[in-house]
Amino acid sequence: VHRRAFVTGTLAALSLGSCCSSAPAAPPVTPGDDRFAALAGMCDGLAPIGPDERARRRERAQALMQEHGFSAIFFEPGDSLVYFTGIRWGRSERPMLYLLPARGPGAVIAPAFESRTLRERAGEDLAQHLWQEHESPYERLAEALRATGVGGGKLGVDPWTRHFIVDGARAACEVEIAPATPVLRGCRTIKSASELALLRRANEATKAALRAVSAHVSEGMSEGELAGLVHAAQIAAGLTDTWALVLFGANASFPHGTRGEKRLARGELVLVDAGGALHDYQSDVTRTWPFGPVSSAQARAWQAVHRAQTAALAELRPGRSCEAADAAARAAIAAAGYGNDYGRFTHRLGHGIGLQTHEDPYLVRGNRDLLAPGMTMSDEPGVYLVGELGVRLEDIVAITEGEPEVFGPRAGSIEAPFG
């Protein structure tokens, strides 16, 4: 790959990426908000994933590569890089790639001027194949393949890798390139005891934060103001990278929100979908509760969603399909009189969770993948009545050998939404 072709392809990819809209900024929060002091220390006592566990992950990946016919896999900065190496690195137009062969140690392909920074973050033992600014990083990738004894075969790529990098690698390496999904999914969907502990605590912390915030909801406050409190409470509990979606009344009939911000009035439902990270592992919790008197329509919708969540839990057992839980929840919503299919339960039941808030496995019609112990996912049915209300309840669930484990208390009733 000539340097000119590399630069041209990179610029084209960046110009396409600039068209994407960015998420709204988090509302300002006041550090050390005394209202949430009781949450302090919730996330203490758990260590991040260490180098020994990451080494076992790489060994597992290599076994899966051999099983599925991959000579090597590579990926750029992101969750897979963190998962296997612990290296955190931002993506830019300059490729930084990690190569893991089916046998032997991995290597990194990086800009030469970043070499010392890489050694600080990854240690001295990681082999580096460095490229100067006028050179092609993909030639260095081909060089790294030869150095690790991979002269041909199938090269796996993380599905989240940008297209211009895949194109550059394909042209320079002259090998078959295929998605490394069987390897990455085979490693990341089954959580270790350490991962489960982090996910459990993160979700317990978000639930405690939402309970604490509910005591400070007041008439006339805006969705953004309440979101700020949710951020502050989660930070007080020890989470990082917090986020919050707050919707009042009819705005909650948009599952992921609407542009018009609303102020809270008595008699409306409050929907909060929130989360954060504990040592990179995510929480994702939704609660819906009333502010003031509860109408019969609100109570009926809330109860239907709670029953649907319970019906789905009964299907979250090892050996059952991902689509079975979605079907059970959808049947419960229909039985409550809210129509079949996607009419008022407009989205899939759930998604996997780990380093990413949304990852495999997905609980959706057509996904016949089988559940297995160690998988973690959301159980989040909803009912959305346009122009009137929205109700969603979401808990993170771990598949076990028997009954599923729900991380933190489930909602008890519309009057006791925090368990």
Task: Describe the residue ranges of each PLM region.
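Active-site neighborhoods and metal-handling regions in enzymes and metal-associated proteins
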Residues: H2-G419
